[in-house]
Amino acid sequence: MPTLAERLGSSAANASGSDKSSHDREQELRSRLFASKQTSRNTAHQDLASSERRSIDRELPLASRHRSRSPLSSPQNGSSPRRQRGSPSYENQPSTVSARMPPPPQPYIHPDRRPPRPQADRWVPPPREDVQSDRSPRSYPRRRDDQRWQANERRANQDDSRRAWTSSRSGDRRRYFDSNDDRNPRQEDREAPSEYGAAQWKRLQRDPYASSMSSGGNQGDGNGGFFSSRNEQRKKSTISIWPPSPPHPTLDSDEEREKRKRHRDSSSRHRDKDKDKDRDKDKGKRDRKHSSSDKHHSSSRSHRHHSSTSRRRRSSRHSEDDKASRHRHTRSSRSHHRDDDDDDDDEDVDVDGRRKSKRSRTKVSDGSDSGRSESETDSDSDARSSRHRRRHHKSDRSSTHRRRESEKRHRSSGQRSESESSLHSEHNQKETAKSRRDSVSASASDSDVEVGPTLPTVAADGKPVDPRAYGGALLPGEGSAMASYVQDGKRIPRRGEIGLTSDQIEAYEKAGYVMSGSRHHRMNAVRMRKENQVISAEEKRTMLRLQAEEKAKKEREIVSQFKELVDTLQPGSSEAK
């Protein structure tokens, strides 16, 4: 086994021969040996890896090669701008290729306590240029791969500032964020200026840290200057969806506010009127439909009945009975509808009046033939008077109508109209007198009633209330003073407000002060004396002694009274025995 001097050279051999016992020299030689072993191991590893990779490339066909562009599958060249990371000394295992001597012993350090690796030692991927230079053209079918190869060639011929790894990390960002390889070069050229407006599946996936990492040299490409291009696009746009802001706040004057309010009130009033008119029209239509349906029903029924009875001998009698029943039916249905719709307007009343005049004419014509003209005139006057009565007395309409109909059933047409006119006139006179009486009494009661709370004239026990009694717990002179305030019509001051006049107190209350006051000044004096009173120990003992003496005195009096009672009862009891 050769010595250290033989391995390091002749100079080291002379030095070691002259001074072999020096410990410092031994350490220096060991460090030199370790450095030489490290460099030889690195070169051996690189040679072995390159030879293995070349042999694999020769054995495997070109179509089965991995297409990944990751740095793990790319060959390592000596022209890389970043060197390969050298592992620390504690991770190195003794190599049998170039090391014949074990490394110097080192103390064991737990993995948790080992110092962290420096940032510069981290693995950095090599640039794309090395990958493109060593990669041979592929021989598998040229479908999309031909287009991809052309895109790669075009990308390789671009500016070196975008491709160099050291200038900017964003230049090689397509290694991780590349989804544009499958696109047609014509499509790429056409869609390049409008890259932001492209569809979501055609957009490039941008690096979120591109704007922070790139300083400004890569603003020209589509990936790095996204925010700046968006800002330029926003500045160039002339269309705005937001309304322009007013230059200054508009202050409405009082006149404009009043005009606006008046306009709102008038429009709401017009709307209410239109609604009322529509409602009245609907009611009128409903009433007309009901009456027409009743007429149609009764006429059809009478027609059927008349046609069936005309074949028999009693046709005239059946037709008369049917007419009477029909009139009764229409009267009952009409009175029912009138009771339901008591709140109709004057329009509906006129329509009902017209219908009623027609019905009265038909009744008179169906009745006796002798007094036809007189009954028609009477029925017209009756319809006019009933219309006037319905207009002014809607509440009594149904009752008078029923009474009139019952009279019509039993009397002739002429007598019926005369009695109705007399009844209507009497009823109108009664109603007018009653309304006059009610209005007079209401006006008198309005003038007599006092608004607000009143004092009770009778107490709870039934005795009349004395207006001069202002309470039970009053000091002498307070009642008369309160009576004088009441006679003058002034406010009675509360207790504790003696220093102020009633006008001053009222002014304070109007200003917002609560002038309730405290109790009487005597009570205040007693309260202050009791608060400031301090009882000493001697005073307490004297008070207890006085209380004990009073108690003993009371007990002696009770015992003496009991003895006297016993002495008076004993002689009587002995004499009785």
From Swiss-Prot:
Q: Cite the residue spans of the region called Disordered.
A: 1-479
Q: Biological process GO annotation list? A: regulation of gene expression
Tell me, what is one Gene Ontology molecular-function annotation carried by this entry? chromatin binding
The record's InterPro entries line, in alphabetical order, gives:
NKAP, NKAP_C
Coiled-coil regions, chain positions = 529-570
| Compositionally biased tracts (Basic and acidic residues) | 20-31, 50-60, 127-163, 170-193, 265-297, 363-385, 396-408, 417-439
Superkingdom of the source species = Eukaryota
Tell me which UniProt keywords the record has, alphabetically. Answer: Coiled coil
Q: PANTHER family per the record?
A: NF-KAPPA B ACTIVATING PROTEIN, NFKB ACTIVATING PROTEIN LIKE
Name of the molecule in the record = NKAP family protein UM04995
